[in-house]
Amino acid sequence: MESSTTTSYSVVSELEGTLLKNPKPFAYFMLVAFEASGLIRFATLLFLWPIIALLDVLGYRNGSLKLMIFVATAGLHESEIESVARAVLPKFFMDDISMDAWRAFGSCDKRVVVTRMPRVMVERFAKDHLSADEVIGTEIVVNRFGYATGLIQETNVDQSVFNSVANLFVDRRPQLGLGRHIISDSPTFLSLCEEQVHAPVPSNYNGHNQRLHVQPLPVIFHDGRLVKLPTPATALIILLWIPFGIILAMIRIFVGFLLPLWAIPYVSRIFNTRFIVKGKPPAQATTGNPGVLFVCTHRTLMDPVVLSYVLGRSIPAVTYSISRLSEILSPIPTFRLTRIRDVDAEMIKKELSNGDLVVYPEGTTCREPFLLRFSALFAELTDNIVPVAMNYRVGFFHATTARGWKGLDPIFFFMNPRPVYEVTFLNQLEVEATCSSGKSPYDVANYVQRILAATLGFECTNFTRKDKYRVLAGNDGTVSYLSFLDQVKKVVTTFKPFLH
């Protein structure tokens, strides 16, 4: 192979097995089935996995692909598939990226990704995070009402990909092709490329990319309830665990209501829940003295409850917007902010005069090791500021959602076999670090953000609540408040496995 350092190259790369280490797309269809539909579709696709694997072994790759697409998407609205592709799949794709393949792919100016998966599942990730110019994949047939039929337009997927690449490069063949060496009756897109590199791409391929040290654009916001990629083995474990998880969650929540707050960290060990406390929490404010403002990182809806558990007393929390059910279930008082600055400032001052209070300047949760921009409002209202770094670990289910219903966040948290919460109390801010010393509220907020990020090993960002919800849900993150009957219906439909 000729060595070249030119940046004018065009590249066509296969996604499965090349840019992604995993050559099998089955787990990604499982994600679509679970997140866009429910447990019945998820279980059905899992039970068909032996047939899908057998078809692959026998050489019927198109047949196995069409079966996966049909079971995962038939009856789903196109917007639901797009929503999962936008909010859920990028995280799992990014976790499986081959950096050697990325370096070769990222060194070229014109980048084309080819995949056997439906284009709608891949396009958002490839363009946003891999800077791809074009994505060539299968096309799902959608009826006039916007629902997927489960069928695809292509009869022979490999031949269709070959034709699409050929039509895209009419004037000149692509210089570089990255892909697996596959025996096929149809010509593959690699035969169109001047230079062909078979996966896995060597780590020292061509010795170029000397100028390129950039990483793929990281996934900061993502959604979905599943923590682990649902490979066949993992998916089976999750399915078997769910009934036990629901029972365990109900027991844990009931115990939390029954016992005093100070006893929860001790009793929770019996139910395999751990609370790790670091640092020295401040003493409770005495009568007549203003309370302490706990300024916390925001990881889940459970943050203020866990803070009250480890302090052994009820600490009221101010929230931007939570569901009515979450307010009813909360063992601590919550106060909803109006988003009107003067009104919110007056309310926080009033609550601080009554005792301690907890605020979350990020305004929303973030799952990845990043902190969103801190609102400076808290810095204007008091000098008694105690930063608290909060983080959590779960094994099966995420306890946050942007697309789903937030009222179920605590249930999903307690459905995990061994949830762990870490609470680190930092020292109260010195007077020199507060607005009393002449610092602006923005300087104070940025300082608190930096020390909390350093404590957790996170990175600071300028992203906001609105940025998160625009990426994940296409809205500004405001919760719509439903009637009690509607809340009950939503619980039932969430836990009732269904197939569209």
Swiss-Prot record:
Signal peptide: none annotated. Coiled coil: none annotated. A motif (HXXXXD motif) lies at residues 298-303. Pathway: Phospholipid metabolism; CDP-diacylglycerol biosynthesis; CDP-diacylglycerol from sn-glycerol 3-phosphate: step 1/3. It is a multi-pass membrane protein. The chain crosses the membrane at residues 38-58, 235-255. It holds the Pfam family Acyltransferase. GO terms for molecular function: glycerol-3-phosphate 2-O-acyltransferase activity; glycerol-3-phosphate O-acyltransferase activity. Keywords: Acyltransferase, Lipid biosynthesis, Lipid metabolism, Membrane, Phospholipid biosynthesis, Phospholipid metabolism, Transferase, Transmembrane, Transmembrane helix. One of its GO terms (cellular component) is membrane. It catalyses: sn-glycerol 3-phosphate + an acyl-CoA = a 1-acyl-sn-glycero-3-phosphate + CoA. Its EC number is 2.3.1.15. The keyword Ribosomal protein does not apply. It is found in: Membrane. Weakly or not expressed in roots, leaves, seedlings, developing siliques and flower buds. Belongs to the GPAT/DAPAT family. The HXXXXD motif is essential for acyltransferase activity and may constitute the binding site for the phosphate moiety of the glycerol-3-phosphate. Esterifies acyl-group from acyl-ACP to the sn-1 position of glycerol-3-phosphate, an essential step in glycerolipid biosynthesis. This is Glycerol-3-phosphate acyltransferase 7. It comes from Arabidopsis thaliana.
